[in-house]
Amino acid sequence: IYFYKSRSIWWIILRSNNLNKTRKDRIMYKSIETVLNCFLMEMYKWEDNANKHIDAGTDIPDEILKQTLKEIYDKYLTDKPRKMGKLECMTVNYPPTFNPNNEKIIEIEEKGSSITVKSDVLYAGMEAQRLYKFKKQAGLWKLDNVNEFDSYDGKWHSIHI
C-alpha cells in the first residue's frame, strides 16, 4: 500500500506483485547502468591518461599501469582469467576502447542469473553495437564479458578487456 497526497486528497494505491516486480527490475537495471557507466568512465580515464603520456613521450611504467588497471578489474569485473585482456597484454588503444560519452544503452535483458546490456557505440568514427554481460559475484553485479557486432561478417566478436 502506498500513500501519496495530490491536491490535498490522500489516495491509497494498492499495487500488485507484478508492479512491484517491475519496480524492482527498474531499480536493478538502474544499478547495472550505474556499474556500466562507472566502468566505462574509469577505463576511459585509464586509457586516455596512458595515451597522453605516450603522446608526450613520458611513458608511465607498466607496473603503475597494471596496478591501476588491476584496481579497475577488481572493482568491476568477474574474477576469472583473461588471457588476452589488457592486463595480460598491456595494450593501450587510441582512441580509448571504452568511452561513456560515445555509448547509449538501448536494451537491458535479464537471462537467468545474468543480465545483458546492449548499447549503440561510436568508436573511431564508426557505429557499432556492444553487448555487456553481467553476472552476480559476491552479491555485486560484475562485468563478465564484452562483445561487439561486426557488420562486415555479421557476427559478435569478443572485446578483450
Residue ranges and their predicted role:
Residues 28-50:
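Short, aromatic-enriched amphipathic alpha-helices that serve as compact interaction elements
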Residues 32, 107-116, 123-129, 137, ...:
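Low-complexity, intrinsically disordered terminal/linker segments enriched in charged
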Residues 3-4, 14, 19:
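Short hydrophobic targeting helices and cationic amphipathic motifs
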Residues 10-11:
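Tryptophan (W) side chains
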Residues 68-125:
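Surface-exposed, charged secondary-structure patches
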Residues 43-78:
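A structured, charge-rich N-terminal accessory region that forms the first stable segment of a protein
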